[in-house]
Amino acid sequence: MAVSAGSARTSPSSDKVQKDKAELISGPRQDSRIGKLLGFEWTDLSSWRRLVTLLNRPTDPASLAVFRFLFGFLMVLDIPQERGLSSLDRKYLDGLDVCRFPLLDALRPLPLDWMYLVYTIMFLGALGMMLGLCYRISCVLFLLPYWYVFLLDKTSWNNHSYLYGLLAFQLTFMDANHYWSVDGLLNAHRRNAHVPLWNYAVLRGQIFIVYFIAGVKKLDADWVEGYSMEYLSRHWLFSPFKLLLSEELTSLLVVHWGGLLLDLSAGFLLFFDVSRSIGLFFVSYFHCMNSQLFSIGMFSYVMLASSPLFCSPEWPRKLVSYCPRRLQQLLPLKAAPQPSVSCVYKRSRGKSGQKPGLRHQLGAAFTLLYLLEQLFLPYSHFLTQGYNNWTNGLYGYSWDMMVHSRSHQHVKITYRDGRTGELGYLNPGVFTQSRRWKDHADMLKQYATCLSRLLPKYNVTEPQIYFDIWVSINDRFQQRIFDPRVDIVQAAWSPFQRTSWVQPLLMDLSPWRAKLQEIKSSLDNHTEVVFIADFPGLHLENFVSEDLGNTSIQLLQGEVTVELVAEQKNQTLREGEKMQLPAGEYHKVYTTSPSPSCYMYVYVNTTELALEQDLAYLQELKEKVENGSETGPLPPELQPLLEGEVKGGPEPTPLVQTFLRRQQRLQEIERRRNTPFHERFFRFLLRKLYVFRRSFLMTCISLRNLILGRPSLEQLAQEVTYANLRPFEAVGELNPSNTDSSHSNPPESNPDPVHSEF
């Protein structure tokens, strides 16, 4: 794909002549200290015309083209994975009763076959962008479907998906096809031609904003004090740091303070020549770590691809010049670029300078307005107050990455029949494909409205919907995020007004976090604790599972009344007091103090503890028999302990079956841990191959349906079954964790077993 032609190749001496000529056309070199430091003089900013001339200064297109190629390539990989092409039929299957969460309620997904067409157009656009083929059209073909899919589902929003759309939008207006592109092969005027400086300025400014605003957001007290990503330091990637530091100090100094300093300084380190090598090292190390720490798709690689934009624009030519001469025929041009109408050239000897035209002024205006808008949006939450909850603004465009971590203890959805008054409960997340609605008032309103349309099909008329959702943010108390007394179907919500039924985050209780950690660390390994904060006038109805044989409630602050429903008894607790709770029964905790109450459940899962003791006994017995210290024969039902599996004979007890399953699980974990790198890498490639294979086959099926019509259901079922096959993987590799790496909503595990309610 190299944009090379025989006439375009030159000798080293002619390269030097062309380079000198290009420099002469571009104007005098910056010899002042400011010019060397910033790349321009203060006088270049003294008037609009000078600024336009600066932003349209002819610049080497090589680095921009490399970024275009890499970004397009990464989007080609992203579409089947994080955009969800491989699992599109599961998300948009026709006829599903599913509650969706678009930005605008008028946005609706197309029928499934047409959604595959949308994704096909997006994929072809990304491919054309990468190759520089029909470049401007390819950018539009990628951009429009991308933003349609993005706006169609708020539950998939995040900072990096938003960034991809911004970068594609910027590239649409740039001349990134002036180097290393098919368009350059077909059009001599575009081949190896200058691009205006603003092409680089916009991209560099965008990446600078991503880093710097992310750093400013990390000045939040929760991040500085080390509560945002408290458990991240347990990852093996931080093992080298833990040779010198404790896990707590690694979390505080490396994860939190190190992340803060890196984000604040990365843009500056990359901008200045003297510090760029340091910046490239640290941001590369940072993004390589992130690619292993988080499931963030192509984000780490896009940021790695953007880093060379801060280097000298001609760095690809210098790289090509070091390659063997024969290989250079297959690589991009290393000759100096030719003039372009997109740029403004300063006067050379004996010639007057070029006056900026309308296109040059539009390019400069676009640069300034776009960067100002990007600086404003992360702080525009005062306009979109309806999207403010415990954290401000829409999710994705604020660059507050990893600042807030949440844990959900309890979610209860209650419906009331508007005519009969009958009460009922819904499984949390019913009719949805996501868990994200639990934290956002706008999604909760959409969910309630959707449920009010679906429940009449199940003989619930005029349904009223109530949500009781308990969340802990950054290791605080579990507390309600929404008022459970409000019917969300009828509740008012506006994107521009504060949502009245969002409960405030109890910031006054934040200092309790240190005390809560002390309490946790003082408990033994078999004792669990849940910390609760509740508002005056509200109560918590809870059930203690029969497995939790030793459960107590202790008041930390305020005053509560505990009602034992079955015994019809009430007991008031004041600060420091506690009481035992009977297992297998309901109880209610009423907050009677004028200020929020704080209390904790302390419990031991006695059933689990007994099981662990029994399994430990079986393990000890197995080891004794194997080393010869146990001479007596094992009963027939315990023989599988030695054989590792059931081979006929009496049916082993449930305890023995549990022991065998655990042993098999531990052996599989050990086997995977000791698997050589090349086998792990091969398994990784097979999983990715399945994703792309299924994406391709399902797309072909849908496009065939659009062109030729749908075949019989039996044939469709056979085709989908074939698309679901994993012909490249061994049977042993087929486990639920391998089903589809692109699935954006894995099942949610219960974080604490204090039962279905808590």
UniProtKB/Swiss-Prot annotation:
Enzyme Commission numbers on file: 4.1.1.90
Protein's UniProt name: Vitamin K-dependent gamma-carboxylase
Pfam families noted in UniProt: HTTM, VKGC_lumenal_dom
Major location category of this protein: endoplasmic reticulum
Catalytic activity reported: 4-carboxy-L-glutamyl-[protein] + 2,3-epoxyphylloquinone + H2O + H(+) = phylloquinol + L-glutamyl-[protein] + CO2 + O2
UniProt enzyme class: lyase
KW Phosphoprotein (keyword) present: no
Outcome reported for the amino acid change (mutating H381A): No effect on activity
Lineage: Eukaryota, Metazoa, Chordata, Craniata, Vertebrata
Active site residues of this protein: K218
A GO molecular-function descriptor: vitamin binding
Organism this protein belongs to: Homo sapiens
Cytoplasmic side: 2-60, 135-136, 314-361
